[in-house]
Swiss-Prot record:
SMART domains: GIYc, HhH1
PANTHER family in the cross-refs: UVRABC SYSTEM PROTEIN C, UVRC/OXIDOREDUCTASE
Protein's recorded name: UvrABC system protein C
Molecular function via GO: DNA binding; excinuclease ABC activity
GO cellular component: cytoplasm; excinuclease repair complex
Quaternary organization: Interacts with UvrB in an incision complex.
Keywords noted in UniProt: Cytoplasm, DNA damage, DNA excision, DNA repair, Excision nuclease, SOS response
Compartment(s): Cytoplasm
Signal sequence bounds: none
Taxonomic lineage from the root: Bacteria, Pseudomonadati, Pseudomonadota, Gammaproteobacteria, Moraxellales
Amino acid sequence: MNQNARPHIEKILANLTQLPGVYKMLGKEGELLYVGKAKNLKNRVSSYFVKTIEHPKTQALVARIYDIETLVTRSETEALLLEQNLIKQHRPPYNIMLRDDKSYVYIFVSADKPYPRIASGRGKGKHQIGKFFGPYPSAYSARDTLLVLQKLFNVRQCENSYFSQRKRPCLQYQIKRCSAPCVGLVSPEDYKEDVNNSIRFLQGDTKELNQELIAKMEQAAADLEFEKAVFYRDRLSLLREVQAQQAVFKVKGEADILAIAYQAGVTCVQIMHVRNGRMLGGKSYFPDMLGDDLGQMLSDFMANFYFQVADEVPSELIVNTALPDRKELEEALAQQFGKKVQIKSSVRETRAEWLELAEMNVQHAIKGQLSNHLELNERFHQLEQVVGRPIDRIECFDISHTMGEAPIASCVVFDQGGARKRDYRQFAIQDITAGDDYAAMRQALTRRYKKAMLPDLLLIDGGKGQLHMAMEVMQELGLEAFMVGVSKGEGRKPGLETLHFTDGTKIQLPEDSKALHLIQQVRDEAHRFAITKHRAKRDKRRSTSVLEAIPGLGPKRRRDLLTHFGGIQGVLKASEKELTVVPGLGEVMARTIYKILHE
């Protein structure tokens, strides 16, 4: 612990209760560093300050603690719920176990009548009315399923605003992925049947679908409707192809299977999802964990995952190690999601197969991550030797714009586990002279560190000038930050970078230096993040700025134009006659728009 805070901390530890509750670790300025729960507050909190702690993350946390606050609860379940609420509210830096905490992807069937749409999105949108299917472990797997649904059942996936404006079928109809309900080329009854079949497919009811398609194909052939028979035959072939690729189990029901593994400082949790007897896939997580007991670590991960990331919990959670607080976690999940949840570590038959599959995947994933982890640790170690101080967290800023247009500042965050994408931030720069990178960097740094905690190393891309400006910002904010400026070498070639320090010294690392490789990795990621966000902002601005120059064309009609033609490129390609079709434009405005866009 910090030596200045030792007397105060020791006094707190001596007076701690042995009741269950929640504890909060606070930093020098009173900022919340970490929230934890405990069955026995005295034992748990005191364990952070024993000399045998070896985990670097725990050591870094303890070194920053200046104060501790506790809240006593009536039970461990209550402590768990309170802990997760505090984490969700404050997002303490040492509680963030998941580097990328995006919600899972779900496939959604809307309740729009008479022509529902099928789409995908992250999380269960509470503003949406309809049916959700999932979770899918990645956007790719959800898109793959949507593509199959398009080919099988031709259900629309377009936005309602686009759908309502159509006057003729779009490209999806031409390539046989939509039945064009927008222009009435399919009856509501036939479309409803396609939607219901899509839902049955998503629910895993493919056996009956198979039989129905066979019956329809045979009936069409008997009626000498050979085109229709070929249509059903093609659908049947595609359905069987999809079935062959899916892992389908005889046991119905829903379950998440979680397997944890730990090796050489790397923790991996593999989650597999089974819904309606179908394996939807899985995802590997590499959380930052404080602890050395696998059961407790998995329990902490599950609390974090199901309370902070997941939109739902299945009725059954199968784990590869017993949890010390299984009952408390079951009760907390039941309260949170309003359903009974069972956590099982001893299973047989099909469930044992699921668990074996998850364990096989977690071992495979941790081996792949381990080599990356060891290389990254070595890079951090060499950088620590170069700068002469311990480094756990690095933040790097970059500015991106096109001739001063749509400036964006990015901030990326790395620690010894790699990129912390959930900590990334972007800043839309405003009210500066176009192209003034110094002013842009000043604004970004000021906005970031007015509230956020300083990292162990702040990398400034831009060299000596930007570094001096950053020093001024820190002085104005009353902060002491360890900063290094990075300037590119002659010809801006990688490997010739120079590091500038706040005391005026500078060094140039050899091209094969692992410390240099880490700096390049962080800087390049900051550049990638900045330029990606800048291009999106620039393109969005350009798509509307051309239309904004047209007199008499207000925001609503600009929006209608873009919606009708699918974007600015569609508007530019449209003829004068096609422009008149847009509701509310009329011939005069259509002629004006066409003339201005094509002068």
